[in-house]
Amino acid sequence: MEAKNTKKPSRKLVVFKRELPFYLMLIPGVTFLIIFSYLPMFGLVMAFQDFTPLRSFKNSPWVGLKNFHDMLALPTFWNVVGNTLSISIAKIILRLLVPLILALLLNEVVHHKFMRMAQTVFFLPYFLSWAVMGGVLRNLFQYDGMVNELLGRIGIDPIMFLGSNTWFPIIIILSDVWKDMGYNMIIFLAAITGVDPALNESAALDGANRWQQIWHITLPTIRPIVVMLLVLSLGSVLSAGMEQIMLLYNPMVYKSSDIIDTLVYRLGLVNHQWSLSTAVGMMKSVVSFILVVISYRIASKHFDYQVF
């Protein structure tokens, strides 16, 4: 009688069978990433061509760096870069500062029900899309909107908030902070609650007041979290929020609120300058990548913070 084959399946095969459902669930996300993130990279060749859809990639003539030269020669280019940097930097600073202050204040709240309610109120706008937020902001700040109606009741003339080069960037920045501050606030609050209570108790016994405990214990302890969020933010310093601005802006505020992404949109989809539009977008991507590398090096060297 032949001996039965009792060889056990390999450990790798067992693990693969166990994890197969998870791999299958990854397929839609990976497919979406490949189609909408990696395949479009082949279009970067347009930045070095005089591209038109009728001639396609194959027959469009190569022009070298001409499109990048034309990009720098655009009369509005440097104004657009300045708008992008000013709006984006203001957003980055306030996205860190406002949530941090709110987290410190909520950490001092004694009533847990009030704290949970406040967390919900601050975090709720984060789940709203900019399509919804754009409608809310228009109803609030348009010429016959709620804000101007309230101003009129106290004797102040209506203000064209959405048509003013002074007010429009302020609305863009503050509304972005309002929408996203809940996310960072939760992160900061979780980090603060992780601070060892014994440190604060020892400091209190030594005569430190609450402000001194926050300044010398809480803030240094959560510094790695702040650095992490800052590093993640610096990579998007050239992304000032296209969806938000596109839903609200108009030609009256191009001077103060036209950013790189909206310039790419107008050049490509409105003016049909495909190659020039691609050159501007490629410039933004390359500079953003360099900024990510630099910010990581700074965080690693000066704050002893490493991601990989």
Model-assigned labels for residue ranges:
Residues 18-308:
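A structural signal for multi-pass alpha-helical bundles of membrane permease subunits
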